[in-house]
Amino acid sequence: MQRWPKYGGTDVNTRTVHDLLNTINTMSARIKTLERYEHALREIHKVVVILKPSANTHSFEPDALPALIMQFLSDFAGRDINTLTHNINYKYDYNYPPAPVPAMQPPPPPPQPPAPPQPPYYNNYPYYPPYPFSTPPPTQPPESNVAGVGGSQSLNQITLTNEEESELAALFKNMQTNMTWELVQNFVEVLIRIVRVHVVNNVTMINVISSITSVRTLIDYNFTEFIRCVYQKTNIRFAIDQYLCTNIVTFIDFFTRVFYLVMRTNFQFTTFDQLTQYSNELYTRIQTSILQSAAPLSPPTVETVNSDIVISNLQEQLKRERALMQQISEQHRIANERVETLQSQYDELDLKYKEIFEDKSEFAQQKSENVRKIKQLERSNKELNDTVQKLRDENAERLSEIQLQKGDLDEYKNMNRQLNEDIYKLKRRIESTFDKDYVETLNDKIESLEKQLDDKQNLNRELRSSISKIDETTQRYKLDAKDIMELKQSVSIKDQEIAMKNAQYLELSAIYQQTVNELTATKNELSQVATTNQSLFAENEESKVLLEGTLAFIDSFYQIIMQIEKPDYVPISKPQLTAQESIYQTDYIKDWLQKLRSKLSNADVANLQSVSELSDLKSQIISIVPRNIVNRILKENYKVKVENVNAELLESVAVTSAVSALVQQYERSEKQNVKLRQEFEIKLNDLQRLLEQNQTDFESISEFISRDPAFNRNLNDERFQNLRQQYDEMSSKYSALETTKIKEMESIADQAVKSEMSKLNTQLDELNSLFVKYNRKAQDIFEWKTSMLKRYETLARTTAASVQPNVE
């Protein structure tokens, strides 16, 4: 069979090369057309800039030439362009590359001095193909009488493009489902862009439409007044953003918790007077309890000692958690190393598996070809067996005829000898008697006998020619037997190659099973790590709740101290603390808060690092597992849309299920390979037995023909010719059938290559879209991290400013 060269696992034939050349020529023609279009577009932009220097060239749309002309060149409709003193072909030419040269002319020589770098003034937009303009038939605009304008006039109605209509429809749909200020701003931008394209003298209209955005100031008026009032009365400045509600809720939550700690009852808001009364009463109780519990020049109170105990306990707990996090990070590192090792082993096994799969595909093709040849040989053997049986029957008949002919020949020989004797006697008698009549009679008899002898000699010559033809047929049979022996040797060579491939396959199967076992062990370790992480997360949440309560309690005391230090503070009873003691306690609490915040920040960083390492490990496992297995797991078990799933958001159970599905798939493929190998060995053994049987049959026929010389001498020529004709017909049929089958196989192979190439192109397109989505998500994550860092920095500065004491 004909073997085509391969490129990337695909057969490369003349048809593929022809298609590639046609594609290259088409792309080259399109690129030249685009270059000419881009050159003309740059010349138009230069004309626009010269005629109207105030034009914003950065907002030009390359595929909207009519809108460009209507927008920037409508004022010059009645102006004589020839009166311009600018040389367009000379001015600003340094901003553009030279115009494309036709194919028949040689390219211009490059200039000797290096050209200066081109400023990115006109080259900051992507190049698009020419906009496909469609010229509708001219229609007469409807005339309508407009009141208040001064009579009847014709109105020029504009028509939106398909892109503008689709964009407005999408905005309308979004505004119907979820009305937000961002959608309103998008609508205003789209409307301004449409007005700029379709309306002449649109400056006033654009200004009017842009003023719609000032409605936001009316919407935000109440929030602005609220924030200004809060700042005037509390010296705390808020901003109108997504954290405004959270900040206010934090203050309210703090008040309710302090109210519960002091009053031992839940706070319920009814009226403003009640809230004022509760606030004054709560402040009085806290002030009284603090002033009574504080002694002059005394060391820290029982609450301070308890706070130290709590801090030490929290420090110990943070140390334990940090050690545990270090252990988890070490386990993650070891797991990552094992995953990398397994990944390399998996890549090697995958490469070997692909090679074996290609060899198996070649063996399958050879197998199908051998099966086809075997079927043809079986048919030929059947026909030969029938022919041999017919020849045996004919040989039996010919043997009987030969025996009869032998008897006739013996009789003829005896008669000839007797006639010769009679002739000799008659000649003697003639010579003696000279009887003329008797001599004539004898001459007639002699002539008749000579004719009979000639007939017998002709029959002997025919028998000799038949025997020579039978010898040729025997020689041909021997050549066929030799071909069968060569085919048997090639089959034995293929058997050896298959045995070697089977040995390699068994070795790879053992390595693959070992890899699967290691993956299973890694999966178990990952499940244990996930369980440990969940428990650690729960403990972290509990510790965070405890820390929040402690911080709230300490912050309440700190706020009380800050109120005491204010100049407008009027104590109810005589204070028992001096200024030095207050400063001492304030510094002590500030140091404690700073240490606690630093420890909490370290713990948060460690937790974030462990979470990021776990997400990286999940991403690596998901990248190893094929995409179709992940999609099937998500659809069957979690009912989740695949395009909305990120590898970092997958649970550990989903990742484990995907790895298990991958292992099961490879086990099924291994079983299928073993089954196919067994079937192939069985069919190969049957083929060998059939070839051996055919060989023995041909050898027996050859021995029979060589052993019987009478068979070689006395075959009928007519039947042998019929047999020869049938053999030639069968050979021609076999050749024609082989040619047609080869053509069919080539067409099937070409169709398969085309389908596989189309599938490969589809998968490449999907991969490109996935890479685009990945880049977009990565950009969003980077922007989110940047905004979070800015917010954390703002929060840290606000916290530091609030911690500083008010020193007068």
Swiss-Prot record:
Subcellular location, record wording: Host nucleus; Host cytoplasm
Annotated TM spans: none
Main location: host cell
Keyword Repeat: no
Residue numbers spanned by region Disordered: 132-151
InterPro entries: Desmo_N
GO CC annotations on file: host cell cytoplasm; host cell nucleus
Listed Pfam families: Desmo_N
UniProt keyword terms in alphabetical order: Host cytoplasm, Host nucleus
Start-end of Pro residues biased regions: 132-141
Key word Hydrolase present: no
Coiled coil: none
Subunit structure of this chain's protein: Interacts with the putative E3 ligase IE0 and with viral ubiquitin/vUbi.
Role: Plays an essential role in the efficient egress of nucleocapsids from the host nucleus to the cytoplasm.
Name of the protein described by the UniProt record: Protein Ac66
